UniProtKB/Swiss-Prot annotation:
This is ATP-dependent RNA helicase DBP6. The lineage of its organism: Eukaryota, Fungi, Dikarya, Ascomycota, Saccharomycotina. Associated with pre-ribosomal particles. PROSITE patterns: DEAD_ATP_HELICASE (PS00039), HELICASE_ATP_BIND_1 (PS51192), HELICASE_CTER (PS51194), Q_MOTIF (PS51195). One of its GO terms (biological process) is maturation of 5.8S rRNA from tricistronic rRNA transcript (SSU-rRNA, 5.8S rRNA, LSU-rRNA). Residues 1-86 are annotated as: Disordered. GO terms for cellular component: nucleolus; preribosome, large subunit precursor. The keyword Thylakoid does not apply. The keyword Cytoplasm does not apply. InterPro entries: DEAD/DEAH_box_helicase_dom, Helicase_ATP-bd, Helicase_C-like, P-loop_NTPase, RNA-helicase_DEAD-box_CS. Residues 22-32 have a biased composition (Basic and acidic residues). Residues 172-359 form the Helicase ATP-binding domain.
Length: 576
């Protein structure tokens, strides 16, 4: 460092010492405290010293500046890196955050995820009834099931029983735990047994007859079918089961109900509402309400049956004053079953669900955003023909049945009463001319739907006395004939819902079945594609079945077909 700098430093230090010595002795303690609390201010910031020793400070600062400059100069300058030139391109941007799946409001409302979390179960699952545990089925129930020919439960029955048997056990001490049940399962999956078994299990020990369960179905044949099942399951118990029909007047039937009050009622909604409004049925002790084929019942008003029924139930469940006698009253447990369960929030809200649980008999990965499901054992086929061949439609059907050996256990659906009557007669004439005189073909529609005639036709069909049955959508629901192997949609249905119920007449109880769909022209092909877009399938898809009409129809077939048409016309004129 230079001599000028050393001089300036010595002079500053001397002045500092003189300044310290001039402090009065009385202020020593105060100065010590201040020094501890406040750091000493640098001398160069004191204006008094700066004015007295301005020149010395200037020399000191310039010397320090020179020394710093020399140190910097001694350092080796860093080499600049070569900058690689790039073309003008957009700057990279981070990925925009997106939902994993964006679903429209309409698609969201086409399922029931908004109501509750679905419980999925595989359609092919089975389990012996004797293996149900915690709690098990009663020995009497297992005995009755075996007498009916049932050893194992199907998928829908397993799912429902697993929940309902636990509810029955739990509700003996916790009556507030009951939750409603919605079940979407294909036709022929065993829904009737699924709700009948837990109801009988729960009520089999009751001593005093009271209306404790009501089962609603859309048609009279279903009433008979459900009542028969309940009677078989309740053998060995004292349960009273009745069905409400139009055989008696409301008054006569009402008097019988009051004289001998039943435990379980099977009815259509309209008939039940008539008895409720006339005061013949009390819902005070009601525990179970089952709505089978719920989509059809909710789509039809039946004198506002839903609002009336739920309001009558609420009269006894919405108790304003709790006391010892009603504190353990069970809520009415609702069970909703359908192969095409509606997703309409407006319709479902009328039922006022409590803690709902949803069971879907289908594979979760394969489920589409619709509540229409088909049996896993069903094989579907589409037969496409040109519109020019539509005039030969009955002949093509006849030749198809013969070529594929579909001559028994065949159910054919048409669009109207006239179409079913005409096709059944024409098929009989064509089959006779083709050498198949032994094939018995019958029809069933609203013109011959009396109880006796209908029962005889279905009985003969199940025994194969009738080989081919031509029908309308009247029997698309409610007939349970396990022997049906083939369903043919001669005329396409009006909706996906009707399609599901039509083809559900086969492939029942995990048996294999076949469905054939006849499409003539581009219009029918387009309509069929639209119908199928809303139907859920587990694994299989619809197969295109190619049929060469040139090979199928021989040279003399068209002339024979014309003769058959003439004979049919003559029969109609003779009947007229």
């Amino acid at each position: 460092m230079s001599s000028d700098t050393e001089e300036a430093s010595e002079e500053i230090e001397g002045n500092q010492n003189q300044h310290v010595n001039k402090q009065p002795e009385n202020d020593d303690k105060m100065d010590i405290v201040e020094d501890e609390e406040t750091p000493e201010e640098p001398i160069e910031n004191d204006p008094n010293y700066m004015s007295k020793h301005h020149s010395v400070f200037q020399k000191f600062k310039s010397s320090v500046h020179d020394v710093k400059g020399e140190e910097v100069d001694e350092e080796t300058p860093e080499e600049k890196e070569d900058i690689e030139m790039q073309d003008l391109v957009p700057l990279p941007q981070p990925e925009l955050p997106r939902d994993k799946r964006l679903v429209s409001t309409a698609a969201h409302l086409n399922n029931l995820d908004w109501l509750t979390t679905p419980i999925y179960t595989a359609p092919e699952e089975t389990k012996p009834f004797a293996e149900f545990q915690n709690p098990p089925l009663s020995s009497l129930m297992i005995k009755n099931l075996r007498n009916m020919g049932f050893e194992s439960a199907f998928s829908v029955q397993i799912s429902v029983l697993n929940l309902m048997l636990k509810d029955i056990e739990r509700n003996r001490l916790q009556p507030d735990m009951r939750g409603d049940l919605l079940v979407n399962a294909s036709t022929g999956s065993g829904k009737t047994l699924a709700y009948s078994i837990p109801i009988i299990e729960s009520l089999q020990t009751v001593k005093v007859p009271r209306v404790r369960a009501i089962i609603l179905v859309p048609t009279k044949p279903l009433i008979n079918q459900v009542k028969t099942t309940l009677n078989q399951l309740s053998k060995g118990t004292n349960l009273s089961i009745v069905s409400l029909k139009n055989d008696l007047s409301i008054k006569e039937e009402g008097i019988k109900l009051q004289t001998n009050e039943p435990d379980i009622i099977v009815s259509t909604p309209g008939r039940l509402v008539d008895h409720l409004t006339n005061g013949y049925i009390s819902l005070k002790n009601l525990q179970y309400l089952v709505i089978d084929e719920a989509d059809r019942l909710l789509n039809q008003s039946f004198q506002n049956w839903c609002q009336i029924l739920i309001s009558k139930i609420d009269e006894f469940t919405n108790i304003k004053e709790r006391n010892i006698s009603n504190s353990w009253k069970l809520n009415v447990q609702k069970m909703i079953f359908s192969a095409t369960l509606t997703t309409d929030a407006g319709k479902l809200s009328l039922l006022k669900f409590h803690k709902p649980r949803l069971i879907i008999v289908n594979n979760k990965e394969q489920l589409v955003n619709e509540m229409f499901s088909l049996p896993a054992t069903l094989n579907e086929f589409k037969l496409q023909f040109g519109s020019a061949k539509s005039s030969l439609k009955p002949l093509i059907l006849s030749k198809f049945l013969l070529s594929k050996n579909k001559l028994a256990n065949v159910l054919i659906f048409t669009k109207s009463n006239d179409a079913s009557l005409r096709l059944s007669r024409l098929l009989s004439l064509i089959m006779n001319k083709l050498g198949s005189e032994t094939i018995n073909i019958a029809y069933i529609n609203s013109t011959n739907n009396t109880t006796s005639v209908r029962s005889k036709i279905l009985k003969d069909f199940s025994k194969q006395t009738i080989n081919i049955l031509v029908a309308t959508d009247l029997i698309a629901r409610g007939i349970d004939i396990l022997s049906i192997t083939d369903v043919i949609n001669y005329d396409l249905p009006n909706s996906s819902r009707e399609y599901v119920h039509r083809v559900g007449r086969t492939a029942r109880a995990n048996q294999e079945g076949f469905a054939y769909n006849f499409c003539f022209g581009k219009g029918e092909a387009k309509w069929f594609k639209k119908l199928m877009a809303q139907v859920g399938r587990s694994e299989k898809n619809i197969e295109e079945l190619e049929l060469d009409t040139k090979q199928l129809i021989e040279d003399n077939d068209e002339s024979m077909y014309k003769e058959s048409l003439d004979e049919l016309q003559q029969q109609v004129f003779n009947r007229a």
